[in-house]
């Protein structure tokens, strides 16, 4: 044992305050908005709009709140899924429980969750990365991960085979407050326009491979997905 008789105990450094929170108290939430703290104002604006127009119970929470309560303060995409599963499980245990139906992530994402490439403008909300990272056609980021919350609904291969996602998941890929405000306004405009022929038009985009006969499977996969979408009635 080495003892430094001339030293002293370290002095704790005060970093800041942590506000009290209790996300576990939430219940009967139909629409959840998980937002980067930079876009709280826009997220609350959208929540109030849906509450008024659709009569839904909407909750707005920040990524910091989710991480604090579901991953001990460590940024982790699984914390978002754990939060949604908590809401789902709470509804399943109640005779008249309201299940969460929609999850909106307000903030851009990137494959570089650890920030190694210093793409701060893109890394607003962490993404889930597929476990098959060594295969070019099976490696991807997918927000569907956050919507598989029912017991037994998610496993190693479920993102490839399971089509029964429990919660609809969307993302506003915004990096600035102005972008978030623009997308919120687009939602409001969508409601204001009402029904019409414009709602029957779909734009389908698909990537392809430069070498169409390549064994990589890029071309056939992308083309088949595009054709499947365009045949929907």
Report the location of each language-model feature:
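Cysteine-dependent hydrolase recognition
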Residues: 1-233
């Amino acid at each position: 044992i080495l003892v430094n008789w001339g030293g002293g105990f370290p002095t704790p450094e005060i970093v800041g305050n942590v506000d009290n929170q209790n996300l576990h108290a939430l219940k009967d939430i139909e629409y959840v908005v998980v937002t980067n703290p930079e876009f709280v104002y826009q997220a609350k604006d959208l929540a109030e709009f849906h509450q008024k127009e659709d009569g839904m119970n909407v909750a707005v929470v920040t990524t910091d709140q989710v991480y604090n309560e579901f991953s001990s303060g460590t940024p982790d995409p699984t914390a978002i899924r754990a939060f949604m599963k908590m809401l789902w499980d709470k509804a399943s245990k109640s005779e008249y429980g309201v299940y969460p139906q929609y999850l909106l992530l307000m903030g851009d994402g990137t494959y570089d969750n650890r920030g190694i490439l210093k793409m701060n403008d893109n890394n607003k909300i962490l993404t889930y990365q597929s476990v098959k990272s060594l295969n070019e056609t099976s490696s991807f980021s997918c927000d569907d991960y956050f919507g598989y919350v029912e017991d037994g609904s998610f496993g190693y291969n479920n993102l490839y085979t399971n089509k029964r996602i429990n919660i609809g998941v969307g993302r506003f890929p915004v990096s600035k407050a102005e972008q978030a405000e623009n997308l919120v306004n687009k939602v409001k405009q969508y409601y204001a326009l009402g029904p019409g022929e414009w709602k029957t038009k779909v734009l389908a985009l698909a990537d392809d491979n430069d070498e169409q006969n390549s064994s990589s499977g890029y071309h056939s996969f992308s083309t088949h997905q595009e054709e499947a979408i365009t045949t929907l009635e």
